[in-house]
Regions:
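Thiamine diphosphate
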Residues: 17-170
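Internal gly/pro-rich beta-alpha loop/helix module
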Residues: 1-9
């Protein structure tokens, strides 16, 4: 929030409800701490596949990588989703190392952020890709008040684990 307050441009802050109960490290005593604008965070270093995610799905990705155990995935939390602030340097460095990309998001396959991201990765890093960009998304149904229907609509750890195994053996 501090970064958004210091920015001179309009800002939209997305607070994902699944992140409310989570806890993480923050700089102790630094009440004015700001995230660097336009910088992704490498949450796990790896050499076999680059996994790009954001918001609550980053936690599911890390859980899936641990569960699978046999895939050395580099997990990148995008953090900044506007097109002008995407951290292409971090993404590109990882792709040149792994040569494979898996994009993970909760939303539906249709006109999602991941579709644009996959297209842009193909344009920018085609020569470094040994495999088509893969995606894990939620179902076509919208999340609803029913927990059963919500589970059917949103991607979780199991879907990510399956995709990691698939892309690693391809």
């Amino acid at each position: 929030m501090n970064t958004a307050l210091q920015c001179r441009d309009p800002v939209v802050v997305l607070e994902h409800v699944d992140l409310y109960p989570s806890a993480g490290e923050v700089p102790a005593g630094e009440w004015d701490f700001c995230l660097p604008v336009g910088r992704a965070a490498v949450r796990r270093a790896g050499s076999e596949v680059t996994v790009l995610s954001y918001l609550a799905m980053t936690g599911y990705v890390l859980e899936a990588v641990t569960r699978v155990g046999t895939v050395d995935a580099e997990v990148i939390d995008l953090r900044w989703l506007d097109r002008a602030s995407v951290d292409w340097d971090t993404i590109g460095e990882s792709i040149r190392k792994t040569n494979r990309v898996l994009i993970v998001e909760q939303g539906a396959l249709g006109t999602s952020y991941g579709g644009w991201l996959a297209d842009e990765i193909q344009r920018r890093f085609f020569d470094w890709l040994d495999h088509p960009v893969q995606r894990v998304t939620g179902g076509e149904a919208s999340p609803t008040i029913s927990k059963v229907l919500e589970r059917a609509a949103i991607a979780r750890t199991e879907e990510v684990a399956d995709a990691l195994i698939e892309i690693a053996k391809a």
